[in-house]
Amino acid sequence: MTTATISLSTLQASRPSVAARADAAARWRVADVEALYALPFMDLLFQAQQVHRAHFDANEVQLSTLLSIKTGGCAEDCGYCPQSAHFDTAVEASKLMPIDEVLDAANAAKAQGATRFCMGAAWRSPKERDMERVTEMVREVRALGLETCMTLGMLDGEQARELKDAGLDYYNHNLDSAPDFYGQVISTRTYQDRLDTLGNVRDAGINVCCGGIVGMGESRTQRAGLIAQLANLSPYPESVPINNLVPVPGTPLADAEPIDPFEFVRTIAVARITMPTTMVRLSAGREQMDEALQALCFAAGANSIFYGDKLLTTSNPQAARDRALFERLGLRVQGERPAVRTSDN
């Protein structure tokens, strides 16, 4: 039997159950994840929707807002990133944003319905002189009643503990791709560097936000390899952002061929099935997706988005457009009370 013709019942019998995944010895094999990808599209979405409904309200979406608190000039050579100092892009380097400007953005995000505020700095890793300011940002944003998330590059154990002591709820550090594709995109930071940072974050008691990027030229097997890596983290991340590559002029991936839209939906569904209780977040690339494709992603188990007009340096759908889509799909925003409808009759 080939993976292309494997039945749903056979796959369910062979792959680790949710209960078995609680055992650290139980792991997703890349072949099993690839077999999920190979299911008929409707079968895959049906299974993903079943898993989703078992753990979440299928008609609820969580909103996160992402702010670049330090843009450009990064020493890393990530081939997808316009903030890298290695590439000639339109991004201008900036210094770390003043705390009052961060708080203005956080208040605006909260007013628009975001429940989590993510702050990103284009660093290889934060310097000690910056830690006092970023920890103060965490404390001040948290005081507004928002969940806090940061992505600052690599962290050592002490830095992770400082962020935890400040009250940081989530730390984002993506794996980006499968190990066997990673070297084609990045040379200045190893895969193990990323895993070490995730370990430091876990050890400090901070929730992990970790995902990857599809559409960089990887194969389906390599997409399955990324999902397997994420699902086999012990435990798997509380949040998994799935990014659809936004090709940026001046970067090595500027001319990358776009991924098939149904393959992107399959990636969302496979992430949901392999990581049943995680928040699967639609991240970069939504501006290039039509509403029908986004609706399929929600049906496949996505239950979070980055909300707001900009993601670091790339565009994002306007908040009003997202709200209109939620209304048409009957999706409720997490943390908001349903609107009370009145009638003139």
From Swiss-Prot:
> What CDD domains is this protein classified in?
Radical_SAM
Q: What class of enzyme is it?
A: transferase
Q: Which Pfam families match?
A: BATS (PF06968), Radical_SAM (PF04055)
Any one GO MF term held by the record is: 2 iron, 2 sulfur cluster binding
Catalytic reaction(s) noted? (4R,5S)-dethiobiotin + (sulfur carrier)-SH + 2 reduced [2Fe-2S]-[ferredoxin] + 2 S-adenosyl-L-methionine = (sulfur carrier)-H + biotin + 2 5'-deoxyadenosine + 2 L-methionine + 2 oxidized [2Fe-2S]-[ferredoxin]
Q: In which pathway does it act?
A: Cofactor biosynthesis; biotin biosynthesis; biotin from 7,8-diaminononanoate: step 2/2
The name on file for this protein is: Biotin synthase
Q: Which species expresses this protein natively?
A: Leptothrix cholodnii (strain ATCC 51168 / LMG 8142 / SP-6)
